[in-house]
Amino acid sequence: MFLGWERLVPHDTQLLALRYPGREARLTHAPFRRMSDLVEQILSATLFLEDMDLYLFGHSMGALVGYAVCQEMKARGRRAPSGLVVSSSRPPRGTPESAPIRTRSDASLCEELLALGGTPPEVLKDPATRELVLSSLRADYELLETWTPLEGPIDSPIHEIHGDADTLTEDDVDGWRRSTTSDFHSRTVPGGHFYLSDSPALATHCLTDLIRSRRTTNHQ
């Protein structure tokens, strides 16, 4: 999903991508089932960036992971990221609003994936591949549905971005607005939940704008 992004961000920006177990080349690796375990891994992996300006970008579940990382950094007294871009995601909530999605049938989860887009239908037709994909998806939902966000907003600016054909609402956008004590910006772009697969520049422009605005602020 993020291949080629290094050509779309400022030349003096180092782009690092996290590949979760249970994804792509790590599809056969056991996925995380608890947010705390995933956040701990990310915090360890980013220790060498402690003295640098760190910007986090998260799409869908990744947006909530990024937010959880910011919360934990704040709780531990680590330097706050210079910004967080949340893409195609509802804001963090303390308790699930409905029955756990991870307990749904395979057919129901396949319908969910196809409705969101981003997953070729032929992938779900192969039984072995479908089992791997759904196992990873159930783990993702378990991670989200068992996660209780820490109390209080983060101190990093948040830029929210979503497609105009996605199912996010104004209440969702307001939820993200309330999730930071710093600046907040929201942007609606053409497309659905996976708008960035077809038009990655829409997402990288948002990230670039955040980086440039923070650099301007820091030099004033």
Locate each region found by the language model.
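Non-catalytic, mobile gating and regulatory segments of ester bond hydrolases
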Residues: 1-220
